Amino acid sequence: MSATINPVVDNSVFTDCKVADLSLADWGRKEIAIAETEMPGLMALREQYADKKPLAGARIAGSLHMTIQTAVLIETLVALGAEVRWASCNIFSTQDHAAAAIAARNIPVFAYKGESLEEYWDYAHQIFEWASDGSHTANMILDDGGDATLLLILGSKAERDPSVIANPTNEEEQVLFASIRSRLASHPGWYSRNLAAIRGVTEETTTGVHRLYEMEKKGELPFPAINVNDSVTKSKFDNLYGCRESLVDGIKRATDVMIAGKIAVVCGYGDVGKGCAQSLRGLGATVWITEIDPICALQAAMEGYRVVTMDDACDKADIFVTATGNLRVITHDHMLKMKDQSIICNIGHFDSEIDIASVQKYQWENIKPQVDHVIFPTGRRIIVLAQGRLVNLGCATGHPSFVMSSSFTNQVLAQIELWQNGKDYQKKVYVLPKRLDEMVARLHLGKLGVKLTELTDEQAHYLNLDKNGPYKPEMYRY
């Protein structure tokens, strides 16, 4: 049977959505069709599982960037039997034509580019609103950054102890805590009811995974979680090769700057930082790295990068990129010392890496959406991209379809695993087994014309391996 979902002819009565413009649906559908040709992993899963419907009965609350590639993920989940409600995990990352195309298929989606923080948290609640009478709730979470998971857990804590939302430390927490207080007043017990129904969560990104491990360490993880980020076919491909292409796409769309000849500082030399450094060097920039980890710092030095501190670099470089997952990596003092027209941006999940709040007191001049001048009293200006949020999604369209197919194939397999076998898992964080990692890679080889060498029986015996894998031990680093 065909894995293609039949289009909805008349969606004029469908109102369970919030998108910028439904008239963009045809445009979105055309781009989705192109993306499908570049996402062999997801399309293979549709063909393999469409008849079996392994996600039948699953009601997935999805919080992940609402892009064209995510539309292919959503429709794959639906093809495999799931019901889905979706919101973006970033206020700037939605592609409005992608959201419209999903809404046109009568799939509830709540996302548009340029949401306010109030809308963002309202939409995060909406993905759990399965039935107005409370007869149905979400039973799975697909998360990116951990906000959907955090919302239910923090809200449940606040039902027992309102003091946990009494002292916000930043603007985002102010809005989140106010949203929770409002829901506590209007829907008593809503958070704990929804939390109790969740079988598990699959988490996409480094920052969200860090949150999950922290909860596990404290004994506060309420359900099993699968760490999709640390699948090799996610972290070593999406984080590295995806960022290698999408970082400079965002910078150049936003600024039209010539990168060749500039000094660019990449803060953080993990998988994301490695991809960013490669792309900037490839376009002719002199790349400097900042790092806290001696191993990563040594890797950077051995690749020929100069490893410095932000204090060393802030008054010398032209472009600054944060890729750490930390907070206040670029401080107020750093920005005050930067050269006129220096460009600063972030490619980590949250907007905490650049201390944007500290420069709100200065004059801001909007150049175009997600591109601003901050004008200091001296008259010097710096260019801030996407208000310190994800530059590749705020100023461009994120990673290419092919590399997202690898990540999202892991997500689908993780959802199937938790939905079908969740009772076998404890309230811990797990990683998909090596055999599935290798399966994801295999599904993408044909598109690139790759031919694998097959072990002979003699070779397999010599290496003590199954001819069909897995080929590496779990601790192998790649």
From Swiss-Prot:
Entries under Gene3D superfamilies matching the protein: Adenosylhomocysteinase-like, NAD(P)-binding Rossmann-like Domain
Organism: Nitrosomonas europaea (strain ATCC 19718 / CIP 103999 / KCTC 2705 / NBRC 14298)
Cofactor(s) named in the record: NAD(+)
Positions that bind NAD(+): 205-207, 239, 268-273, 291, 326, 347-349, 392
Main location: cytoplasm
Keyword 4Fe-4S: no
Pathway note: Amino-acid biosynthesis; L-homocysteine biosynthesis; L-homocysteine from S-adenosyl-L-homocysteine: step 1/1
Protein name: Adenosylhomocysteinase
Molecular function terms from GO: adenosylhomocysteinase activity
Catalysed reactions, semicolon-separated: S-adenosyl-L-homocysteine + H2O = L-homocysteine + adenosine
Record key words, sorted: Cytoplasm, Hydrolase, NAD, One-carbon metabolism
Purpose of the protein: May play a key role in the regulation of the intracellular concentration of adenosylhomocysteine.
CDD domains, per the entry: SAHH
GO cellular component term, pick one: cytosol
Binding of substrate, residues: T67, D144, E204, K234, D238
Domain of life where this protein originates: Bacteria
One of the protein's GO biological processes: S-adenosylmethionine cycle
EC numbers, comma separated: 3.13.2.1
Gene label: ahcY
